[in-house]
């Protein structure tokens, strides 16, 4: 469920509880909540004896909102999972845009989520620098970006899209890749947070 700021939280959680009790869902999942609101929602659901196990939020090297709004810490403290959508930043964290915007990219064919103005020289340089870090790890940029999302165990899963089965198989290799060094994490932060 995605948060509706115009509906009282108690009403929303009550409706979600009814969905679970009626057998239409096994548990509650929340999407795009901040840390404080998630804690309040979790308390309401706990009082209702309704299982709540997962948060779904956008999270990637470039988008760290769940760190800034307290959700990541609140989920860890409350032993709730997080599933990250857009872990590759709509494809920005792949090798697809290392040399600019390809003619057949979603920027040109489907401009709903990714726009040409997001690819200024500063962003492209950041992507290229991140790619160099990935190469030094023996990984593709996509693999490193996925590893970064799940690096500390707080994010329990990622939603990945793929246009080819081979992409999924390549991305699964992150499950066996080496942990990041402190130096690598600092370099990643320098690349991403300089935007």
Predicted features and spans:
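Beta/alpha (TIM)-barrel catalytic core signal, keyed to glycine-rich beta->alpha loops juxtaposed to Asp/Glu
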Residues: 4-195
